[in-house]
Amino acid sequence: MPLLTIGDQFPAYQLTALIGGDLSKVDAKQPGDYFTTITSDEHPGKWRVVFFWPKDFTFVCPTEIAAFSKLNDEFEDRDAQILGVSIDSEFAHFQWRAQHNDLKTLPFPMLSDIKRELSQAAGVLNADGVADRVTFIVDPNNEIQFVSATAGSVGRNVDEVLRVLDALQSDELCACNWRKGDPTLDAGELLKASA
């Protein structure tokens, strides 16, 4: 399946996830208390930043996940939910988070796409059967507004994902390198100036 692109509807999903937050503070009576089911219907009216990484216990992936974690409040301020996805099990996610200092207090859920259904539907699976490093920004109408994919050896720029979300939410024409608070482009004024 080809990679989904701008204007496509993001696929429906129902996946087991490791909950977000400081796992050491969860009042868990049994292992299942660390997990939840997350569906595509869970965040109505919200923007979603859905990012896929190849595998847990790798080298580039935790740097990206930690970067999303550091900016989580910024995304929340923009009414956007971050959802991280890989083909690893929820138990692998748990073990990785428990062992990696930068992931221990991750504020958003880590979804397990162990059956590869969402990864396949989104077109992010590579020839090795793992997800490529892909980020989607999905609007409140479930329409994809941004897609970014990088080589496995290159981490994504989370600041750029936030910048693009700001630009999309401005609903204006935004020039190259535009940042929230910068003036937007006025097409009418630009047309007058060029006449």
Curated annotation (Swiss-Prot):
Induction: Induced in isoniazid (INH)-resistant, KatG-deficient strains as well as in INH-sensitive strains when challenged with the drug. Increased expression in these strains probably compensates for loss of katG activity in detoxification of organic peroxides. A possible member of the dormancy regulon. Induced in response to reduced oxygen tension (hypoxia). It is hoped that this regulon will give insight into the latent, or dormant phase of infection. It catalyses: N(6)-[(R)-dihydrolipoyl]-L-lysyl-[lipoyl-carrier protein] + a hydroperoxide = N(6)-[(R)-lipoyl]-L-lysyl-[lipoyl-carrier protein] + an alcohol + H2O. The active site is at residue 61. Changing residue 174 to A: Very poor oxidation activity of dithiothreitol and thiocyanate. Keywords: Antioxidant, Cytoplasm, Disulfide bond, Oxidoreductase, Peroxidase, Redox-active center, Stress response. The active site is a conserved redox-active cysteine residue, the peroxidatic cysteine (C(P)), which makes the nucleophilic attack on the peroxide substrate. The peroxide oxidizes the C(P)-SH to cysteine sulfenic acid (C(P)-SOH), which then reacts with another cysteine residue, the resolving cysteine (C(R)), to form a disulfide bridge. The disulfide is subsequently reduced by an appropriate electron donor to complete the catalytic cycle. In this typical 2-Cys peroxiredoxin, C(R) is provided by the other dimeric subunit to form an intersubunit disulfide. Homodimer; disulfide-linked, upon oxidation. 6 homodimers assemble to form a ring-like dodecamer. Identified in a complex with AhpD, DlaT and Lpd. This is Alkyl hydroperoxide reductase C. The lineage of its organism: Bacteria, Bacillati, Actinomycetota, Actinomycetes, Mycobacteriales. The gene is ahpC.
